[in-house]
């Protein structure tokens, strides 16, 4: 059974939808949301990412987005919904309303749509970040109506607005909390730092009023700025699904509640234990809020690559309307529009130049440092910058179909994916928070039973320290933040990871297998030799061969036809043309049967090519690809073409060797030619004379011995090989990045991108391991310290205040370490 037939018989691929989620703070939240979503009927899988605050949900059939939204809400979190109000033109009756609603609801990412005939408006609820106006407009037009946007999104303007609002809210909360906590801290602990503070308080307001004031300040902190912890933590406790917020609530409430008892009814406590810990409760809230604020700022920096990509597209374009160019919103541009670009302006959408000449800076898209010349019929890409001249072009792709939109989607998909290395984290986070609560209970019991006097005070302080120091956030952020920054940095270098897991697999590669034509070489062969056999004229042979090759799409055919044109040789019509991949082409030209191909093609037809064995050996030794031509069943000529090696290829091979990788070349060329090229470039292994369908078997052979193989090809002809390899890398694809079989796409044809991708993969996985080590080592080592295991030997106990500071900084450390990937510059 062929691969195509297997695909045809396979089940349809699940539909994927992304959901923005508010309220997640730690890895336990991630696990809870995933569990809630996967319980929805029709959901195949759910992948929740704490760093991006998004869930990628795969559906088996028709997506039931409303059910997923309800599941997220039921789990205690808020799905991020944006509301668009749209003006619908052309509706006349209730049937129109039904038709428009149905069309809008069918758009991926639309949670609900309500259309009002009287006002001629539609209110559309969008899952934030998954659908844009152009998709809604296309749906409405497809139903036979016209649409125009009347006002911007109201409920949520998108991820950036959400992050900015959250950051502002946290900043205000931290400021208020600090202003109230500082005097509270000085009243209770000031005498440890400033002599005379205690006497001053006693001589002015007195001890009783001091306690009342501490109670008031601590209460304001807990139920003012700290109320966010209660709103999320308490419901999760009641659902028996505690999270990070629940730990903060338990710890601070225990300290505050004990202090309230000690303040107002101290007689119910054992003698000598009526101590207050108001400052501990307030400082814990303040430090955790500060940690959240710093974490939110760092999270914003991890997504800067996406922000930069989104910022590449201009808001308006000068479009030809009614015989003159007028400024129009980018959302109003449609395929077929004629657009004018002046020097220094950004190109708004993808298109083809119809007039003018200029140089365009495509570095932000392809990573190519030098501007590219654009003339008539040249393709231009939205988001690139016109440098010198003025050009006019016709729009070919707009909205979500543009290359820039596809790149953004690929990067977002990669950033939201999980790596195999995260499996351990997922297993641990399921029981981590309940285990911490159990540890706190055991700590309290142990100190209350066996601790020194006052045992109740010791038990309370140490139990609170255990609750506060535990940090599932660091574990939840360890992997996704590194993936976000790593894939974002890769995008800046023109490297697109279509699948996040390719980051890990690429790092494990042992062998890099390269297709020759178009990958190692420029893919533009040139005719270098044509030696006619006795009884044939060279120009006559070239005429017949070039005529036949006009119907072939192979690069070698283009070289032969181009050579004939340069000599002024006109081609003739061809009858009975046949092409056999990996062998050659045949047909009738001017009444004569012509066959052109490799030696195996002629041998199959019973034609002996040994008469040109000497020439073939010399041509092959010099790296040229020999072909043979037969006319009327007789050997007529040997033809040689040479495909120049890319200037960047030798350095790329050296870079791969420096990374400790074996380099192999897979080609359909004869062995002599292939080995000559391999020697010149320093390639370790050669798999020659491979038919297109034989590349898959070649990769399987290279994989023998347990080796992991990364295959680099053009992404189109090499699709089966790209899919077979452990990691498939499509190189030099230009504007075509929608290659399902490739795990990684290199925007430019520079093979150095392969070494950069591998180096970045290694750096990212190392960064993830550092984060995971820190997250696990932090919790494994400091939770016992907070419980007081060092006290019997050293007399050291960990204050809940220091526990809060350590917990707040642990997530910031993980994020800061991930951000180091932004400066990675692989050679």
Swiss-Prot record:
As recorded in UniProt, its EC number(s) are 7.2.2.9
Instruction: Report residues binding Mg(2+).
Output: 714, 718
Quick one: which residues bind Cu cation 1?
A: 26, 29
Catalytic site positions:
515 (4-aspartylphosphate intermediate)
Q: A Gene Ontology MF term for this entry?
A: ATP binding
Subcellular location, principal:
membrane
- Superkingdom field: Bacteria
Q: Name one Pfam family in it.
A: HMA
Residues covered by the HMA domain: 15-80, 82-148
Q: Which reaction does it catalyse?
A: Cu(2+)(in) + ATP + H2O = Cu(2+)(out) + ADP + phosphate + H(+)
Gene Ontology process terms (BP): copper ion homeostasis
Which InterPro entries does the record match to this protein?
Answer: ATPase_P-typ_cyto_dom_N, ATPase_P-typ_P_site, ATPase_P-typ_TM_dom_sf, ATPase_P-typ_transduc_dom_A_sf, HAD-like_sf, HAD_sf, Heavy-metal-associated_CS, HMA_Cu_ion-bd
Function, as annotated: Involved in copper transport.
Protein name per UniProt: Copper-transporting ATPase 2
Organism listed in the record: Rhizobium meliloti (strain 1021) (Ensifer meliloti)
Q: Which gene encodes it?
A: actP2
